[in-house]
């Protein structure tokens, strides 16, 4: 269809909310979008209302479209996400930042409290669940977690038991008061406890309390009293470059600046569309704040977000001061990073061009790399890592537990298992442009055979290591072993091989830990199913139980059992 035919058809599209798919002449999905009014939004692509350097390219490729009408904006959001996951379209953006920040999670139970750290936030949790965060990674969260556990779950060093529900409601509210600093005497009380412990020569306890105090005081010092009545306020500032959006987010909790995040967002079809996708992805695993303080120009965008987003753009007062602070931090981040990040993106693009000189493929957007790890064929694992536009795409990384084999060719068979598992659970196979097998000709052959069995047509190459386990050469599409003379490309391929090896070994170590504990913990005298479940509820996995210290374990189980776990008395 030509442009005029498409516009004519669009005039008959529903004005309901929904999801639209732009397609090219081969019916490949180019872009997936969401709209409150499908007809209005889709026509904007052809009247110049959506203006960026990428829009013209997209419009030139559009040959057809599909629409899915939805009852609500929320239903459209879920469908859009599913469609993007399914088709991985060329013009949809993916956040470069994949960090997940820990929240302190407090749950009120009938006969206790459950206090832990969680990187997942469930907005549907009941009023008996309280989140506080997000904390900066590796900073502050654990000392405060341990302090709150000590202050609310223990008395005189012993776990509190046999208390009624009202007692635990009070402990639950006590934590809220501590973290909001509504109880101004608490820090003084804690300081007195620390001095008393030191006077009683309980130096370990005194140091423990001192660590918790240090972090609480840092939080208190950053509190803005005028904002203290608000549980959650986030401040968002941004500026655009040619291909990128740079952003700074400040997180205020009860007026306390608890975290700052700097981000680089790929600029998609337009600034408003890119920001809309950013907000939906960014707050997918975070608490949506009571208010989002933003620059005035952001209010003029049609972001097509749910009514749960409360944007305000202050001109005076305390809110304007924190917005100015976010802009100040943003400018500092931009000056330091914009050239560095732009160079990284350009370099990744250049590396793909250099690699493609050896392959001559139509495009190299998504590359998937396979590797496995095992020792003597015990607990073998496989992994797949994905590079999108030359950059690690950790949201698409996958790991697999493989079936152990004893024959000499097991290493080759493990590649087969990994590829089968990856593509059997992956509907958008046609969106992968290249498979890289970590290995030589045997591994590449096995990868090709496996893909053929699965009726998947994707080119395969290999990365060969030498006897010192260093990258040696590339197995090209014609099964030739080629030594890479381009030093930059060689180093780039080395980085890919190091990354897939790291991911495989990390998964293997975790599987070893799990196999060491799973099904064996109850071999320890006095450790029954309830105690095992309590450990799993707290630590979330056998691997984390394996890594826990005696001190951490003894907060959940008796000290003698904690020592038995650490001494591996279950073996």
From Swiss-Prot:
It is found in: Cytoplasm. Residues 184-219 form the UVR domain. Pfam families: GIY-YIG, HHH_5, UVR, UvrC_RNaseH, UvrC_RNaseH_dom. Keywords: Cytoplasm, DNA damage, DNA excision, DNA repair, Excision nuclease, SOS response. Residues 15-93 form the GIY-YIG domain. The keyword DNA damage applies. GO terms for molecular function: DNA binding; excinuclease ABC activity. Interacts with UvrB in an incision complex. This is UvrABC system protein C. It comes from Mycoplasmopsis bovis (strain ATCC 25523 / DSM 22781 / NCTC 10131 / PG45).
